[in-house]
Amino acid sequence: MMLKGLTAQYLLRRTYRVKKGDWILVTAAAGGVGSILCQWAKALGAKVIGVVGSEAKVALARREGCKQVLVMGKDDLVARVKEITKGAGVPVVYDSVGKETFFAALDCLAPLGMMVTYGNASGPPPLMSPMELAKRGSLFLTRPSLFAYIAKREDLDASAKELFRAVTTRKVKLHVGQRYPLSEAAQAHRDLEARKTVGSTVLIP
């Protein structure tokens, strides 16, 4: 809970502070961090557009709080986001996929929007010139990490307190999607890399 939950906390509350009424885009919306992001963002009053890797994950993403769900490889992400937001785009994208979604995610942003790339499930994002941000509407790009946000004890305590409050008030429910015996750890890694998993993955000794 702590690693994924604290990651969601700093993304939503500090990197870009989600506001009531915001349309936001979350990739890997059925994943471990993504599912927490979607639930928590909905509780904050945001409207979540979730991106998932297959049709099989659509229903789960909706249960986790997504108002709209798009499927990679099937939906045109940019066109659908612009349609959903009536041409405005979103103020923030939370992307943990990386290479496969990077440029499409940038093109989903409203002018002055923020691209938050916090994971590389499909490989690292491509190199690009800062001018790409300028020509897309003076966008902001950040690659945050949890440990910079909790380096000070007071920051860790405050973040953990907010996370536990979200869990105990049922704004966030932790979802274990699959369990593997420790002897099948290699298979668990293969399934994670192939993006076959949903929610959190647990290894059982």
Residue spans for each PLM region:
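Hydrophobic/small residue at the entry helix of a nucleotide-binding pocket
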Residues: 33
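Adenosine-nucleotide cofactor-binding segment
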Residues: 26, 42-101, 152
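A glycine-rich, Thr/Ser-enriched phosphate-binding loop motif common to dinucleotide/cofactor-binding enzymes
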Residues: 1-14, 27-30
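Glycine-rich phosphate-binding loop and adjacent beta-alpha segment
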Residues: 44, 52, 100-171, 205
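C-terminal hydrophobic helical "lid"/dimerization subdomain
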Residues: 153-205
